[in-house]
């Protein structure tokens, strides 16, 4: 048993030793294999790194060679430029040297000529002195006395020429000033165009049928009395078909009455209480419209900083008229004319436009009727803090106060231009038509006249004469005779141009 155990132990020990030896052998084999693989891989990595380093070296070498070549090229270019500059400098030095030699030659020549000139000058001085002595001996005057007489003579001649020259300049200035003034006025008129509005002292209110007249009159006339009392307008209800006449000198009252009537007729309820309510409402609307019109006018003209009361007065101009010309349109037209004319004269166009717009504000208020409208307007402008030159332009535009501002004559002229424009102001229609008829009939009384036409609001009369009755020479004498007769027998504004027309027409037909 012991032997078996010993044998087993011996076998176990021998097996362990063999296993250890075998393990060592296998481990060494693996170690050798791994080492060999590592050496092989290291050799590959080494070769790759060497190739990579070599490639970088070659690239760097190529870059350096390019840079060196580029630098060499730049150096070569710089050397070429330097050589060119050296050549230019060399040429300039040669040119300078050549010019220096030429200048020295010219200097020597001038010095030689200067010597000759000095000699000739001495000779001339001697000759002049001799001539002066001879002249003094002949005339019996010294040189100083002769100079004084010559100077006096030249002074008188210069004075005469200067006076003549001054007179010529003054005549030319007068002619030029006249032409320039006409040009400025014409240009101002051409650049300003406004509509002409005609207002009357009555307003016609149209109705759909005459039945409405009875409702407006009311029982025993109470409605019409209430309407007249509320508006201050005379309401004329007569036999005129489908029309009621509103009569009042105050256009604002007429407008209030017209609008109130329109609302009452449209609404259908017409009785004293309703009339008072509608008139009160319309009066507020008209007042708002007046202020809105004033603001819109100042904005359109580019005028700022006006007192609210002045804006209200400007708005009321819409309902005022002067000789049939709407006052607001006249003020706007005058303002634009003033701005254009002031610009042409080198003055402030904004101030001129402001003065032109405000020049007739004295026609609007009803208070102080004893004052002329220009002075009342100046008083209002001063009250509402307008500048002195604008106040003076307002007050002096009808020569009722002294003109101290340059704007005053401009406003005066533009006011006259706006009022005198043909068609701007309305005469009484009957008188206007009668004057035109009288003009035409006056010319028709002459023998040989076949037709007459009064045009341009009666400022031009065209006379057509028969070609077989009057020759060309007689047309001139005829126009003169008609002009003289108009002057002697008629009253008219401005001037009337008479144009006599004589023509012969030959008409044939081609068939």
UniProtKB/Swiss-Prot annotation:
- Give the HD domain ranges: 327-420
Q: Which interval of the chain is the signal sequence? A: none
User: What are its GO cellular component terms?
Assistant: plasma membrane
General function of this protein: Endoribonuclease that initiates mRNA decay.
Q: Which gene encodes it?
A: rny
Cellular compartment(s): Cell membrane
What's the chief localization of this chain? membrane
Q: Which CDD domains match?
A: HDc, KH-I_RNaseY
According to the UniProt entry, what is the EC number of this protein?
3.1.-.-
Question: What UniProt keywords apply to this chain's record, in alphabetical order?
Answer: Cell membrane, Endonuclease, Hydrolase, Membrane, Nuclease, RNA-binding, Transmembrane, Transmembrane helix
User: What is this protein identified as?
Assistant: Ribonuclease Y
* Protein family per UniProt: Belongs to the RNase Y family.
Q: Which domain of life is it from?
A: Bacteria
Q: What class of enzyme is it?
A: hydrolase
Molecular function terms in GO for this entry? RNA binding; RNA endonuclease activity
